[in-house]
A protein has these predicted regions:
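A post-motif C-terminal structural segment
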Residues: 1-195
Length: 195
Protein backbone atom coordinates (compact mmCIF):
# COMPACT_ATOMS: atom_id res chain seq x y z
CA UNK A 1 0.00 0.00 0.00
CA UNK A 2 2.94 2.29 0.57
CA UNK A 3 3.35 2.72 -3.19
CA UNK A 4 -0.11 4.26 -3.29
CA UNK A 5 -0.07 6.41 -0.16
CA UNK A 6 3.58 7.41 0.47
CA UNK A 7 4.63 8.87 -2.85
CA UNK A 8 7.28 11.43 -3.71
CA UNK A 9 4.70 13.57 -5.50
CA UNK A 10 2.63 13.66 -2.26
CA UNK A 11 -0.43 12.15 -3.95
CA UNK A 12 -2.37 9.64 -1.90
CA UNK A 13 -3.87 7.32 -4.48
CA UNK A 14 -5.79 5.41 -1.82
CA UNK A 15 -7.68 8.57 -0.91
CA UNK A 16 -8.20 9.35 -4.59
CA UNK A 17 -9.71 5.88 -5.08
CA UNK A 18 -11.97 6.41 -2.06
CA UNK A 19 -13.03 9.74 -3.55
CA UNK A 20 -14.07 7.90 -6.71
CA UNK A 21 -16.27 5.49 -4.77
CA UNK A 22 -13.89 2.58 -4.27
CA UNK A 23 -13.92 0.53 -1.10
CA UNK A 24 -10.32 -0.07 0.02
CA UNK A 25 -9.91 -3.61 1.38
CA UNK A 26 -6.77 -4.42 3.35
CA UNK A 27 -7.12 -8.18 3.78
CA UNK A 28 -8.39 -11.17 1.86
CA UNK A 29 -11.29 -11.45 4.32
CA UNK A 30 -12.33 -7.86 3.56
CA UNK A 31 -12.07 -8.55 -0.17
CA UNK A 32 -14.30 -11.60 0.13
CA UNK A 33 -16.90 -9.70 2.17
CA UNK A 34 -17.49 -7.02 -0.49
CA UNK A 35 -20.66 -7.94 -2.35
CA UNK A 36 -21.07 -5.05 -4.81
CA UNK A 37 -19.56 -1.81 -6.00
CA UNK A 38 -16.00 -0.82 -6.78
CA UNK A 39 -13.22 -2.53 -4.88
CA UNK A 40 -9.48 -1.98 -4.60
CA UNK A 41 -7.82 -4.73 -2.61
CA UNK A 42 -4.38 -4.39 -1.03
CA UNK A 43 -3.36 -7.37 1.07
CA UNK A 44 0.26 -6.41 1.69
CA UNK A 45 2.13 -3.25 2.67
CA UNK A 46 4.99 -4.17 0.37
CA UNK A 47 5.58 -7.04 -2.06
CA UNK A 48 3.15 -9.93 -1.86
CA UNK A 49 4.62 -12.89 0.02
CA UNK A 50 5.12 -16.10 -1.92
CA UNK A 51 3.33 -19.33 -1.14
CA UNK A 52 6.19 -20.57 1.06
CA UNK A 53 5.80 -17.43 3.19
CA UNK A 54 2.29 -18.41 4.21
CA UNK A 55 0.40 -16.52 1.50
CA UNK A 56 -1.96 -19.46 1.37
CA UNK A 57 -4.82 -19.33 -1.11
CA UNK A 58 -5.33 -15.56 -1.06
CA UNK A 59 -4.50 -15.34 -4.78
CA UNK A 60 -7.21 -17.85 -5.66
CA UNK A 61 -9.71 -16.11 -3.35
CA UNK A 62 -8.88 -12.75 -4.93
CA UNK A 63 -9.52 -14.06 -8.44
CA UNK A 64 -12.82 -15.59 -7.33
CA UNK A 65 -13.90 -12.33 -5.69
CA UNK A 66 -12.96 -10.31 -8.78
CA UNK A 67 -14.99 -12.55 -11.08
CA UNK A 68 -17.97 -12.50 -8.69
CA UNK A 69 -17.98 -8.70 -8.42
CA UNK A 70 -17.28 -7.94 -12.07
CA UNK A 71 -19.94 -10.35 -13.26
CA UNK A 72 -22.57 -8.03 -11.74
CA UNK A 73 -21.84 -5.40 -14.39
CA UNK A 74 -24.38 -5.08 -17.19
CA UNK A 75 -21.93 -4.65 -20.05
CA UNK A 76 -19.56 -7.48 -19.22
CA UNK A 77 -16.00 -7.08 -18.03
CA UNK A 78 -12.34 -7.49 -18.84
CA UNK A 79 -10.19 -8.96 -16.08
CA UNK A 80 -6.42 -9.21 -16.30
CA UNK A 81 -4.82 -11.34 -13.60
CA UNK A 82 -1.07 -11.36 -13.22
CA UNK A 83 0.97 -13.90 -11.30
CA UNK A 84 4.69 -13.30 -10.98
CA UNK A 85 5.30 -16.00 -8.41
CA UNK A 86 6.15 -18.89 -10.77
CA UNK A 87 8.66 -16.65 -12.54
CA UNK A 88 10.13 -15.43 -9.26
CA UNK A 89 10.52 -19.02 -8.01
CA UNK A 90 12.19 -20.03 -11.28
CA UNK A 91 14.70 -17.19 -10.99
CA UNK A 92 15.47 -18.37 -7.46
CA UNK A 93 15.90 -21.96 -8.62
CA UNK A 94 13.35 -23.16 -6.07
CA UNK A 95 11.72 -26.33 -7.43
CA UNK A 96 9.32 -26.74 -4.49
CA UNK A 97 8.03 -23.20 -4.84
CA UNK A 98 7.66 -23.51 -8.64
CA UNK A 99 5.47 -26.56 -8.08
CA UNK A 100 3.33 -25.02 -5.33
CA UNK A 101 2.89 -21.72 -7.21
CA UNK A 102 1.93 -23.61 -10.38
CA UNK A 103 -0.71 -25.59 -8.47
CA UNK A 104 -2.04 -22.33 -6.97
CA UNK A 105 -2.18 -20.69 -10.41
CA UNK A 106 -3.91 -23.77 -11.81
CA UNK A 107 -6.68 -23.41 -9.20
CA UNK A 108 -7.27 -19.78 -10.25
CA UNK A 109 -7.33 -20.74 -13.94
CA UNK A 110 -9.75 -23.55 -13.10
CA UNK A 111 -12.15 -21.05 -11.52
CA UNK A 112 -12.00 -18.86 -14.62
CA UNK A 113 -12.68 -21.88 -16.84
CA UNK A 114 -15.60 -22.95 -14.63
CA UNK A 115 -17.04 -19.44 -15.02
CA UNK A 116 -16.56 -19.56 -18.82
CA UNK A 117 -18.32 -22.92 -18.91
CA UNK A 118 -21.44 -21.31 -17.36
CA UNK A 119 -21.23 -17.93 -19.13
CA UNK A 120 -21.14 -18.74 -22.83
CA UNK A 121 -20.04 -15.27 -23.96
CA UNK A 122 -16.73 -15.54 -22.10
CA UNK A 123 -13.15 -15.91 -23.30
CA UNK A 124 -10.34 -17.05 -21.01
CA UNK A 125 -6.77 -16.54 -22.22
CA UNK A 126 -3.82 -17.94 -20.30
CA UNK A 127 -0.38 -16.69 -21.31
CA UNK A 128 2.91 -17.84 -19.88
CA UNK A 129 5.50 -15.27 -18.93
CA UNK A 130 9.06 -15.45 -20.22
CA UNK A 131 10.56 -18.82 -19.38
CA UNK A 132 13.20 -18.47 -16.70
CA UNK A 133 16.19 -20.63 -15.86
CA UNK A 134 15.52 -23.50 -18.24
CA UNK A 135 13.88 -25.81 -15.74
CA UNK A 136 13.83 -29.42 -16.95
CA UNK A 137 11.96 -32.20 -15.18
CA UNK A 138 14.36 -35.13 -15.09
CA UNK A 139 12.18 -37.66 -13.28
CA UNK A 140 9.41 -37.89 -10.75
CA UNK A 141 6.03 -39.17 -9.72
CA UNK A 142 3.08 -36.81 -10.06
CA UNK A 143 0.91 -38.91 -7.74
CA UNK A 144 3.44 -38.43 -4.93
CA UNK A 145 4.09 -34.81 -5.95
CA UNK A 146 7.76 -35.64 -6.12
CA UNK A 147 9.89 -34.42 -9.02
CA UNK A 148 13.56 -33.99 -9.73
CA UNK A 149 14.39 -30.89 -11.74
CA UNK A 150 17.55 -29.47 -13.24
CA UNK A 151 18.22 -25.88 -14.22
CA UNK A 152 19.91 -25.50 -17.61
CA UNK A 153 20.61 -21.76 -17.50
CA UNK A 154 23.31 -20.60 -15.10
CA UNK A 155 22.47 -17.30 -13.45
CA UNK A 156 18.76 -18.05 -13.55
CA UNK A 157 18.03 -15.82 -16.55
CA UNK A 158 15.21 -15.83 -19.10
CA UNK A 159 15.60 -18.25 -21.97
CA UNK A 160 14.52 -17.99 -25.59
CA UNK A 161 11.95 -20.74 -25.18
CA UNK A 162 8.57 -19.99 -26.70
CA UNK A 163 5.82 -19.59 -24.12
CA UNK A 164 2.35 -21.07 -24.46
CA UNK A 165 -0.92 -19.27 -25.08
CA UNK A 166 -4.08 -21.17 -24.21
CA UNK A 167 -7.58 -19.89 -24.95
CA UNK A 168 -11.03 -21.22 -24.13
CA UNK A 169 -14.44 -19.90 -25.04
CA UNK A 170 -15.87 -17.49 -27.55
CA UNK A 171 -13.15 -16.27 -29.92
CA UNK A 172 -10.58 -18.80 -28.77
CA UNK A 173 -9.90 -19.72 -32.40
CA UNK A 174 -8.14 -16.33 -32.77
CA UNK A 175 -5.40 -17.46 -30.38
CA UNK A 176 -4.05 -20.54 -32.11
CA UNK A 177 -0.62 -21.21 -33.53
CA UNK A 178 2.60 -19.30 -33.06
CA UNK A 179 2.32 -15.54 -32.58
CA UNK A 180 4.27 -12.61 -31.23
CA UNK A 181 3.33 -11.73 -27.67
CA UNK A 182 2.55 -8.19 -28.86
CA UNK A 183 -0.11 -9.63 -31.18
CA UNK A 184 -2.19 -10.65 -28.17
CA UNK A 185 -3.18 -7.03 -27.57
CA UNK A 186 -4.46 -6.59 -31.12
CA UNK A 187 -6.33 -9.89 -31.15
CA UNK A 188 -8.07 -9.04 -27.87
CA UNK A 189 -8.85 -5.52 -29.11
CA UNK A 190 -10.32 -6.88 -32.34
CA UNK A 191 -12.60 -9.21 -30.41
CA UNK A 192 -13.69 -6.54 -27.93
CA UNK A 193 -14.52 -4.02 -30.63
CA UNK A 194 -15.72 -6.44 -33.34
CA UNK A 195 -12.96 -5.48 -35.75
Amino acid sequence: MKYFSSREDQRNLLEELRGKGFYIAKSIDEIQNVRSGNLAGFTSEDDMPDILQERGDSFVKSVYSAIRLLNQRENGFFLLVGDMFVDRASHAGNVEQVGLETINLDKAIGMALDFAEKEENTLVIVVGGPEASGMTLVEGNLQDRNVVAKWTMPGMIHTGTMVPVFAYGVGSDKFQGIMKNTDLFFRIKNLLFNQ
